[in-house]
Amino acid sequence: AQIVKLGGDDGALAFVPSKISVAAGEAIEFVNNAGFPHNIVFDEDAVPAGVDADAISYDDYLNSKGETVVRKLSTPGVYGVYCEPHAGAGMKMTITVQ
């Protein structure tokens, strides 16, 4: 599985790393790294055609350090992801599915 931290070790409001590539069906573990409230929203305008962004998003907040959400993406292409409360601070990432 690929691990993506929600929040940098230095407290930055960021996905770490901000770009990953995965094989179709490979697990992606999103882990709250800092204890700030974060969520994982797939941008409906930045996912491959036919993908339901709402179905793969995790709108609830991960509030505690160590809380984890796992997603598996099966459709190849590029996915844009953001954290709703911190998108204005630039908390966004790109996932490429091979």
From Swiss-Prot:
Molecular functions (GO terms): copper ion binding; electron transporter, transferring electrons from cytochrome b6/f complex of photosystem II activity
Binding residue positions for Cu cation: H38, C83, H86, M91
Membrane topology classification: Peripheral membrane protein
InterPro entries: BlueCu_1, BlueCu_1_BS, Copper_blue_Plastocyanin, Cupredoxin, Plastocyanin
Gene Ontology CC terms, in alphabetical order: chloroplast thylakoid lumen; chloroplast thylakoid membrane
Compartment(s) of residence: Plastid, Chloroplast thylakoid membrane
Major localisation: plastid
PROSITE patterns linked: COPPER_BLUE (PS00196)
Keywords from the UniProt entry: Chloroplast, Copper, Electron transport, Membrane, Metal-binding, Plastid, Thylakoid, Transport
Top-level taxon: Eukaryota
Keyword Transport tagged: yes
Domain Plastocyanin-like, chain residue ranges per copy: 1-98
Cofactor: Cu(2+)
Family label: Belongs to the plastocyanin family.
Name recorded for this polypeptide: Plastocyanin
Organism: Ulva arasakii (Sea lettuce)
Gene name tied to this protein: PETE
